[in-house]
């Protein structure tokens, strides 16, 4: 588990983000002549996933490129520092998730692209996405569906136009995905055992990934067809 010091730092960081959003909303409202306009709460803001959105479209001057480079460097240093502070067990779980989620993305790249394209045509709130994921996980207890969901949500996060809201989405969905089933699977995989047994079990789990992708696509297609 994270140390209390690290936990407090993370909580403070999230609180700073929340306070900044609230302050931005209040500042914007005070400068707006239409004081009856109600600004949406951050957690209810809509995610718009646009496949054509490219960060390069917003970088037009040398200053823009330099500022982006600085922001990237600072973000990377913060993440690298957090990784170094994590306990060995946490880092081992990160390695496991990296390996298997990369496998999902590679093996089911075409199917997942179809779903990404479908998601790009619609708008969601963070709760819409979380409810759909929660419903899917309740109906399927396999490891594959959870790994496929992580890959899918990660890809959606890359397409989200609002970085702060992306952080909020990842935070909420990490709680949803990390249910008892997922914790049991990951801890089981990380436990040293006979390689043949491990590989056999993993193959069975990974078979569910294709089913997970089809389930998600079918669910979303029916939802939008029915309205």
From Swiss-Prot:
UniProt cross-references to InterPro entries, sorted A to Z: Bcl-2-like_sf (IPR036834), Orthopox_F1 (IPR011207), Poxvirus_F1/C10 (IPR021119)
Keywords assigned by UniProt, alphabetized: Host cytoplasm, Host membrane, Host mitochondrion, Host mitochondrion outer membrane, Host-virus interaction, Inhibition of host apoptosis by viral BCL2-like protein, Membrane, Modulation of host cell apoptosis by virus
Top-rank taxon: Viruses
Classification via Gene3D superfamilies: Blc2-like
GO biological process, one term: regulation of apoptotic process
Cellular component terms (Gene Ontology): host cell mitochondrial outer membrane; membrane
Entry-linked Pfam families: M11L (PF11099)
UniProt-annotated location(s): Host mitochondrion outer membrane; Host cytoplasm
Induction details: Expressed in the early phase of the viral replicative cycle.
Major localization class: host cell
The protein's assembly and partners: Homodimer. Interacts with host pro-apoptotic protein BCL2L11 (via BH3 domain). Interacts with host NLRP1. Interacts with host BAK.
Family of the protein in this entry: Belongs to the orthopoxvirus OPG045 family.
Biological function: Plays a role in evading host innate immune response by inhibiting host inflammasome activation. Interacts with and inhibits NLR-mediated interleukin-1 beta/IL1B production in infected cells. At the host mitochondria outer membrane, interacts with the BH3 domain of host BAK and prevents BAK from binding active BAX. In turn, host apoptosis is inhibited.
The protein, known as: Apoptosis regulator OPG045
Source species of the chain: Rabbitpox virus (strain Utrecht)
């Amino acid at each position: 588990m994270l140390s209390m010091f690290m936990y407090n730092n993370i909580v403070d960081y999230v609180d700073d983000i929340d306070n900044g959003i609230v302050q931005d909303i209040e500042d914007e409202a005070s400068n707006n002549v239409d004081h009856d306009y109600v600004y949406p709460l951050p957690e209810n803001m809509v995610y718009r996933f646009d496949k054509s959105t490219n960060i390069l479209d917003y970088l037009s001057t040398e200053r823009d490129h330099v500022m982006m480079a600085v922001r990237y460097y600072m973000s990377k240093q913060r993440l690298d520092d957090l990784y170094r502070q994590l306990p060995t067990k946490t880092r081992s779980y990160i390695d496991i998730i990296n390996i298997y989620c990369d496998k999902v993305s590679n093996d089911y790249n075409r199917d997942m692209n179809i779903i990404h394209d479908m998601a790009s045509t619609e708008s969601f709130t963070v709760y819409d996405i979380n409810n759909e994921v929660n419903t899917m996980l309740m109906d399927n207890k396999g490891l594959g569906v959870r790994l496929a969901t992580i890959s899918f949500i990660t890809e959606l996060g890359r397409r989200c136009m609002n970085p702060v809201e992306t952080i909020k989405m990842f935070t909420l969905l990490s709680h949803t995905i990390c249910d008892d089933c997922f914790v049991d699977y990951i801890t089981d995989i990380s436990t040293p055992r006979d390689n043949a047994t491990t590989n056999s079990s993993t193959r069975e789990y990974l078979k569910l990934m294709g089913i997970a992708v089809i389930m998600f696509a079918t669910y979303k297609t029916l939802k939008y067809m029915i309205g």
